[in-house]
């Protein structure tokens, strides 16, 4: 299979590294050569992921992958959801987590990290989107320094440590890992059928 070069529609170096680590051999992942402003005004992770991929793809005139992901806390009606990155945007994630911990006092702590991943090729006009999640709960305190974002207070189901305490496992079980592996699988099937 011919190697496919894909730009990631992000300037977040953590995301680039996380996706590069799980990318198949037939795909070369590159960070976007330029920062492109995309207003993430969708009501769902899927809408934002598709919008990012299409805007980046049309501007770069090259295949791109984008994602939108975030934390969904069930007892807070899905908050912060698509606003995960923009919630208290001027504050650190540590401050955001402290605020959420206060909001959760006396409430159910079930939560999920959700990721929608999209591939867009503007030349072939191919658009593929998938979504996956990892279920878990919010810890009673911030624990661990690994990972990024809300990782230090999210405990995935089946574990007693936060993603911040087990960053080496996160690449295998995270929402982003699951969504992108699913996307790679769909892409591989399409590419194999085109090469026949």
Swiss-Prot record:
Protein name: dITP/XTP pyrophosphatase
Keyword Hydrolase tagged: yes
Reaction catalyzed: XTP + H2O = XMP + diphosphate + H(+); dITP + H2O = dIMP + diphosphate + H(+); ITP + H2O = IMP + diphosphate + H(+)
Gene3D superfamilies reported in the protein's UniProt record: 3.90.950.10
Its EC number(s): 3.6.1.66
Name of the top EC class for this enzyme: hydrolase
Superkingdom of this protein's organism: Bacteria
Entry GO CC: cytoplasm; cytosol
Subunit field text: Homodimer.
InterPro entries membership: dITP/XTP_pyrophosphatase, ITPase-like_fam, RdgB/HAM1
Functional note: Pyrophosphatase that catalyzes the hydrolysis of nucleoside triphosphates to their monophosphate derivatives, with a high preference for the non-canonical purine nucleotides XTP (xanthosine triphosphate), dITP (deoxyinosine triphosphate) and ITP. Seems to function as a house-cleaning enzyme that removes non-canonical purine nucleotides from the nucleotide pool, thus preventing their incorporation into DNA/RNA and avoiding chromosomal lesions.
Keywords: Hydrolase, Magnesium, Metal-binding, Nucleotide metabolism, Nucleotide-binding
NCBIfam families: RdgB/HAM1 family non-canonical purine NTP pyrophosphatase
Any Gene Ontology biological process: nucleotide metabolic process
Disulphide-bridged cysteine pairs: none
Binding of Mg(2+), residues: 68
Pfam families linked to this entry: Ham1p_like
Bound cofactor: record note: Binds 1 Mg(2+) ion per subunit.
Keyword Cell inner membrane annotated: no
Family: Belongs to the HAM1 NTPase family.
Cofactor(s) the protein needs: Mg(2+)
Residues that bind substrate: 10-15, 69, 148-151, 175-176
Active site: 68
GO function terms (MF aspect): dITP diphosphatase activity; ITP diphosphatase activity; metal ion binding; nucleoside triphosphate diphosphatase activity; nucleotide binding; ribonucleoside triphosphate phosphatase activity; XTP diphosphatase activity
């Amino acid at each position: 299979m011919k190697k496919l070069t894909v730009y990631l529609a992000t300037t977040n170096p953590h995301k680039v590294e996380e996706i590069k680590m799980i990318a198949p051999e037939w795909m070369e992942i590159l960070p976007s050569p330029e920062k492109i402003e995309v207003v993430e005004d969708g009501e769902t992770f899927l809408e934002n992921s598709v919008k990012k991929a299409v805007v980046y793809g049309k501007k770069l005139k090259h295949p791109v992958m984008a994602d939108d992901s975030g934390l969904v806390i069930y007892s807070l009606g899905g908050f912060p959801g698509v606003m995960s990155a923009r919630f208290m945007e001027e504050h650190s994630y540590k401050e955001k987590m402290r605020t959420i911990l206060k909001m959760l006092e006396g409430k159910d702590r079930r939560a999920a990290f959700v990721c929608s991943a999209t591939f867009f090729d503007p030349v072939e006009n191919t658009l593929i989107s998938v979504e996956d999640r990892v279920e878990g709960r919010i810890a009673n305190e911030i624990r661990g320094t690994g990972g990024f974002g809300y990782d230090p207070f999210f405990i995935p189901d089946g574990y007693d440590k936060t993603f911040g305490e087990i960053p080496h496992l996160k690449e295998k079980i995270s929402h982003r890992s699951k969504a992108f592996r699913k996307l790679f699988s769909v892409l591989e099937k399409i590419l194999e059928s085109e090469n026949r």
